[in-house]
């Protein structure tokens, strides 16, 4: 009787896990698509116009001149 009860509980957990993972799979796919779109955004090269929301390529946005610049190292 104990073996049957354990098997029944294991089967219930497996079906519950499978059902809930189906609903979450859609969200995971959307999340990975969003992540991929963020990863493929292009950065702005040196000398191009920028603002506080622009991503400059290994550079920084000089808000005074509003262009991407390479940082000056001493």
UniProtKB/Swiss-Prot annotation:
Disulfide bonds: 43-57, 50-61, 56-68
Signal sequence, start to end: 1-17
Keyword Nucleotide-binding found: no
GO molecular function per UniProt: ion channel inhibitor activity; toxin activity
Keyword list, A-Z: Cleavage on pair of basic residues, Disulfide bond, Knottin, Secreted, Signal, Toxin
Cellular component annotations (GO), alphabetically ordered: extracellular region
Residue numbers covered by the propeptide annotation in the UniProt entry: 18-40
Compartment(s) where it occurs, according to its Swiss-Prot or TrEMBL record: Secreted
Tissue: Expressed by the venom duct.
Pfam families named in the record: Conotoxin (PF02950)
Ranges for region Disordered: 19-42
Keyword Disulfide bond carried by entry: yes
Taxonomy, superkingdom: Eukaryota
Transmembrane segments: none
Family: Belongs to the conotoxin O1 superfamily.
Domain notes: The presence of a 'disulfide through disulfide knot' structurally defines this protein as a knottin. The cysteine framework is VI/VII (C-C-CC-C-C).
Descriptive protein name: Conotoxin AbVIJ
